[in-house]
């Protein structure tokens, strides 16, 4: 089962391009769709996020644990995502962060 990572530069707005109220979704089109990461018994890292990425959408078909960092290592004590989860995370642009994934229960 893979984890999918979609990168966004900014949040969507009620009035596109204006000063409308931010909505809890990335502004499409996303700036990058990473190759899926296979979830397994060992921690696996994503590619570094794009310099303009400020928001990532992580989706997964299976229970897993994730960790963010410049050289992250996920384990079963890290942030848990439920099966069929889709969750946004804010990241600092230009920080060269990655996400690591490992299977969980």
Where are these regions (language model features)?
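Short, flexible beta-strand-to-coil junctions
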Residues: 58-63, 101-105
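Surface-exposed ligand/attachment interfaces on beta-rich extracellular proteins
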Residues: 18-52
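Short, intrinsically disordered N-terminal pre-domain segments
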Residues: 1-28, 103-105
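Short, surface-exposed beta-strand/strand-loop-strand elements in extracellular ectodomains
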Residues: 59-76
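Short, solvent-exposed S/T- and G/P-enriched segments that are highly enriched in secreted/extracellular
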Residues: 39-44, 76-93
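Short loop/turn positions at the edges of beta-strands in beta-sheet-rich folds
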Residues: 50, 60-62, 93
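Short beta-strand/loop motifs in extracellular/secreted proteins, especially
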Residues: 3, 54, 62-64
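Noncatalytic modules at the cell exterior or secretory-pathway interfaces
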Residues: 54, 89-103
């Amino acid at each position: 089962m893979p984890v999918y990572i979609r990168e966004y530069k900014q949040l969507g707005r009620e009035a596109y391009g204006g000063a409308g109220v931010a909505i809890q979704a990335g502004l499409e089109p996303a700036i990058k769709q990473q190759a899926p990461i296979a979830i397994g018994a060992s921690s696996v890292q994503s590619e570094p996020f794009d310099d303009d990425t400020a928001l990532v959408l992580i989706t997964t078909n299976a229970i897993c644990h994730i960790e963010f960092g410049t050289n992250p290592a996920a384990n079963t004590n890290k942030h848990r995502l439920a099966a069929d989860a889709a969750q946004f995370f804010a990241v600092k642009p230009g920080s060269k962060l990655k996400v690591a994934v490992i299977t969980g229960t």
